Amino acid sequence: MSRLQFQLQATDGAARRGQLSFPCGTVQTPTFMPVGTYGAVKGVLPGQLCDLGAEIILGNTFHLFLRPGLEVIADHGGLHGFMRWNGPILTDSGGFQVFSLAHRRKISEQGVTFAAPTDGAQVFLGPEESMKIQKVLNSDVVMIFDECTPYPATEDVARDSMELSLRWAQRSRDAHDALDNDAALFGIIQGGVHPDLRGRSLDGLQAIGFDGYGIGGLAVGESESERNVILEYLHPRLPTDRPRYLMGVGRPEDLVESVARGVDMFDCVMPTRHARNGQYFTGFGTVKIRNACYARDVDPIEQGCGCPACVGGYTRAYLRHLDRCNEMLASMLGSLHNLWYYETLMANMRAAITAGTFFAFRRSFYLARGLDPPPLP
């Protein structure tokens, strides 16, 4: 039996408010998962993540397998002990990272052979290997091993990729069960931007049976409208008693629009990556701190923000100075701000769904940016 219990608590249109319960903690949904690629969210301590409102984080199976390796992580009793995070952890399967290697990989029915980016050594990864790795990591949510369909892709290419992922899904399920792993196992819906293929993928995954469903193969170059069409197609077809995870999609606008279309879980490197590039998220848009207009600006990043950077009184001028000097404190403070913004955005959406005011919240979100909300179906 899976260690995950999911409870759907409220809906407002397609937007869903729920709770994921694990032995190590509960997660309120919709939720945003900070990304700890190498076992750490860049520049942020685990205790700080908790203070910012994060309840679950993502670890990267592919990178942790290559470095430091499973033996080191096993010495710590798994990823929780290794990175000193006591809450739930979701690990991806490594499929997307293998996809990103492009010309350095070879895909077969059995799995993927690739040149490791660390030392060039030939490495094989398939469904069984991915499940074994994630068992050692001892994550609370395990993702199946799949092929991320490229974009653009013809319908024939997308179909072949989706069908391969379905065969790998069955092997992932079998391997996960054979390992007696009580972590939740999520399937991943593929099919490119072709709704009928997405539907076939979902049907096949439901026939196998999973604890939740990831929506993969998006945020790879498709337009926002193409993505929304897929989400709108899947929403009435997905089981209501299972969490839905949109993988790798992370602009604030994307989160709002995807919650409006029934998504429960998100992850993205954007908050910390943008902070390292001097871009800070606010309710009125993005502050690009490298612009000259901030050179003598004594305001915080955003008035009324509760993050350590803004509450601490660090001014835009100071942050710009740090950024221009390549001082690591700039990216640390920026990451704290951006993650606070994301977690607060999710908390505000949860409250609005519970109150039945999500679509009023959505309108105000766009109006604060001087924009009109995009149309909903």
From Swiss-Prot:
The active site is at D92, D267. Pathway: tRNA modification; tRNA-queuosine biosynthesis. Its EC number is 2.4.2.29. One of its GO terms (cellular component) is cytosol. It is an enzyme of class 2 (transferase). InterPro entries: ArchSynthase1/Queuine_TRR, TGT, TGT-like_sf, tRNA_ribo_trans-like. One of its GO terms (molecular function) is tRNA-guanosine(34) queuine transglycosylase activity. Keywords: Glycosyltransferase, Metal-binding, Queuosine biosynthesis, Transferase, tRNA processing, Zinc. Its cofactor is Zn(2+). Residues 248-254, 272-276 are annotated as: RNA binding. Substrate binds at D92, S93, G94, G95, F96, D146, Q190, G217. GO terms for biological process: queuosine biosynthetic process; tRNA wobble guanine modification; tRNA-guanine transglycosylation. The keyword Metal-binding applies. Zn(2+) binds at C305, C307, C310, H337. NCBIfam families: Q_tRNA_tgt, tgt_general. Belongs to the queuine tRNA-ribosyltransferase family. Catalyzes the base-exchange of a guanine (G) residue with the queuine precursor 7-aminomethyl-7-deazaguanine (PreQ1) at position 34 (anticodon wobble position) in tRNAs with GU(N) anticodons (tRNA-Asp, -Asn, -His and -Tyr). Catalysis occurs through a double-displacement mechanism. The nucleophile active site attacks the C1' of nucleotide 34 to detach the guanine base from the RNA, forming a covalent enzyme-RNA intermediate. The proton acceptor active site deprotonates the incoming PreQ1, allowing a nucleophilic attack on the C1' of the ribose to form the product. This is Queuine tRNA-ribosyltransferase. It comes from Xylella fastidiosa (strain Temecula1 / ATCC 700964). The gene is tgt.
